[in-house]
A protein has these predicted regions:
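PP2C/PPM-type serine/threonine phosphatase catalytic domain
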Residues: 1-290
Length: 290
């Protein structure tokens, strides 16, 4: 488990990804960037390892643009343009269907912004599980119009047909979803690819988050449960939020900060020591010349 201070709030986080039981490669990726207050999961699509390239390019572009000061929505939108250019430069066969979903959260103090494209999800957990994102899928559109029931949606043949996906169609107008809010004490974010939500119900996910008290144990338990249910797809999970630290975690965090403060203090004192030494040498030289 890693800890970071974002504004006036202390966050703990963990992330992991697994190829699953039926795939020979992993097209998912994730990022934990505490210096930016940024965490994300991307799920690549496309054959000939194109999905791996797509998700990695989306990840690196978003990190680069957020670092440069872009908003989260603008960074995601730009990653679509970057991916489209990459596809145009590749051979048709290797770039066929190349694209990626993404879900990301950016935290500034207790305020947060979640943005996404596709069916990778963000949840908020504080005893109860709340889905923050809305899947950009054909099935979700049918649900919204009352054309099918939630029960029909779960096994619908078009449940994985995306209406928004980065890179796949250069003519598609990408409109990332976006929600904002305030993170309350004891609440955590769960970011995941559909490899998790296809295997586990919200009830099961909530139970695993409730019974595991650290982000690392939550991530491990969720991925393990998805694999136990079949692991039919790559699965990626990131958990970040406000956890009550154990005494051991508090001591580790304190030691890291103390070590960092000591290193900074030594760096700050070093120029003065050099200046004092040079001054002493100059005085000695003047005395010898007399």
């Amino acid at each position: 488990m890693d800890c970071t201070q974002v504004g006036d709030i202390s966050l703990q986080y963990a992330g992991d990804t697994d190829a699953g039981s039926r795939r020979d490669h992993n097209e998912d990726c994730f990022a934990t960037e505490p210096r930016l207050g940024l965490w994300l999961v991307a799920d690549g699509v496309g054959g000939h390892a194109a999905g791996e390239v797509a998700s990695d390019l989306v990840r690196s572009t978003i990190i680069e643009r957020v670092t440069a000061g872009d908003s989260l929505v603008d960074a995601i939108t730009l990653s679509h343009d970057v991916l489209v250019r990459e596809i145009e430069q590749r051979e048709v066969a290797s770039a066929l269907g190349m694209g990626s979903t993404v879900v990301a959260v950016k935290v500034n103090g207790s305020e947060y912004e979640v943005a996404w494209v596709g069916d990778s999800r963000a949840y908020l957990f504080g005893g109860q599980l709340q889905q923050l994102t809305t899947d950009h899928t054909r099935v979700n559109e049918l649900l919204a119009h009352g054309a099918i029931t939630p029960e029909q949606a779960h096994n619908h043949r078009d449940r994985h047909v995306l209406t928004q996906c980065l890179g796949v169609d250069k003519n598609l107008q990408i409109t990332p979803g976006r929600v904002t809010g305030t993170l309350k004490p004891g609440e955590q974010f769960l970011l995941c690819s559909d490899g998790l939500t296809d295997e586990l119900s919200d009830t099961v996910i909530a139970g695993l988050l409730a019974t595991n008290k650290s982000p690392k144990s939550q991530v491990d338990a969720l991925i393990r449960a998805a694999l136990d249910m079949g692991g039919n797809d790559n699965v990626s999970v990131v958990v970040v939020g406000d956890f009550e630290l154990s005494e051991q975690d508090l001591e580790t965090t304190h030691n890291r900060r103390r070590s960092s403060d000591a290193s900074r203090s030594r760096r700050e004192k070093f120029p003065f020591k050099v200046l004092a030494l040079l001054t002493a040498l100059c005085l000695l030289a003047l005395w010898l010349l007399q």
